[in-house]
Amino acid sequence: MIGDILLFGTLLMNAGAVLNFKLKKKDTQGFGEESREPSTGDNIREFLLSLRYFRIFIALWNVFMMFCMIVLFGS
């Protein structure tokens, strides 16, 4: 059960980091413009953009998960 949850999270994180989304960064606001609350779409966009910067960590996590699958969750 816990192995399935860890595998699901790993695959989801890989999908977000590897897929090449054409996301644009949010425009910066100039003087005199009121700041608004970020929408859900803005939050998702920022999360996917931040995943791109963590590709090395994600690769190390994948190696760790493969080790766990062989040693701990293997039958």
UniProtKB/Swiss-Prot annotation:
| Transmembrane region(s) | 54-74
Q: Which domain of life is it from?
A: Eukaryota
Gene name, per UniProt, is SMIM7
Q: What is this protein called?
A: Small integral membrane protein 7
Q: State the UniProt keywords alphabetically.
A: Membrane, Signal, Transmembrane, Transmembrane helix
Q: Name one GO cellular component term.
A: membrane
Give residue spans on the Cytoplasmic membrane side.
Answer: 75
Q: Keyword Transmembrane helix: yes or no? A: yes
PANTHER family from the entry? SMALL INTEGRAL MEMBRANE PROTEIN 7
The entry sums up its family as follows: Belongs to the SMIM7 family.
> Signal peptide position in this chain?
1-17
How the protein sits in the membrane? Single-pass type I membrane protein
Species, as recorded: Bos taurus
Q: Where in the cell is it found?
A: Membrane
**Which stretches of this protein does UniProt put in the Extracellular compartment?**
18-53
State where it is primarily located. Answer: membrane
